[in-house]
Amino acid sequence: MLPFATIPATERNSAAQHQDPSPMSQPFDLPALASSLADKSPQDILKAAFEHFGDELWISFSGAEDVVLVDMAWKLNRNVKVFSLDTGRLHPETYRFIDQVREHYGIAIDVLSPDPRLLEPLVKEKGLFSFYRDGHGECCGIRKIEPLKRKLAGVRAWATGQRRDQSPGTRSQVAVLEIDGAFSTPEKPLYKFNPLSSMTSEEVWGYIRMLELPYNSLHERGYISIGCEPCTRPVLPNQHEREGRWWWEEATHKECGLHAGNLISKA
């Protein structure tokens, strides 16, 4: 089982008080660092990320189980920077949960929104549910990928809550550290940390319950993988969590594009 022991309060306070808030961006050997972190705890991976990037590291929060990532990062750096995507189609419970997390940790969450100049023509021409007919790619491209691309254009490193057990078809090879193949450019590499990659759903929920973290109330109604309201449904017993997303499409295509590298690497 992956170690994710709780950091004692005295150590958490010390880490928070001594965290250097200035950007560090220290050069490093990517393969060597990735290899050294491969078997480390999520906290150790995040600590290394902060050591190399300081406040240039952004945490991605989806409004679901990745509250664990926010919690771990906040305990290492109280000045942690967090962003979340508001597609305009999230569940009411998710909006409430994002507010809960903001208040619980006393942090600002940078909420990213779609560009209305792109969104309005799509809705006007195809309506609000074109993804059931045309696939989710176009809608996700406007509501998720474009806002994220705008955000990451000014970011040197980010951390996600991706886990290998979330999708055997697309996430089974998620590395703890990689160059983001979807959003890097030749001039500007983007470093992507996945500290929770080796954690299982059971371990994530053990952490949430042990520390009594806030969580999305949709989880109490059978939702596991939570996205936009029209594209998410509860899963049945013995179904994989990803079967609750875009259920009308092939399993191998169940990535919205935020982690397109998972698909690119399999091409």
From Swiss-Prot:
Optimum pH is 8.5. Adenosine 5'-phosphosulfate binds at residues 60, 85, 144, 161, 242-245. Its cofactor is [4Fe-4S] cluster. Residues 1-25 are annotated as: Disordered. [4Fe-4S] cluster binds at residues 139-140, 228, 231. It catalyses: [thioredoxin]-disulfide + sulfite + AMP + 2 H(+) = adenosine 5'-phosphosulfate + [thioredoxin]-dithiol. Binds 1 [4Fe-4S] cluster per subunit. The cluster is required for activity and may play a role in binding and activating the substrate for thiol-mediated reduction. This is Adenosine 5'-phosphosulfate reductase. The lineage of its organism: Bacteria, Pseudomonadati, Pseudomonadota, Gammaproteobacteria, Pseudomonadales. The gene is cysH.
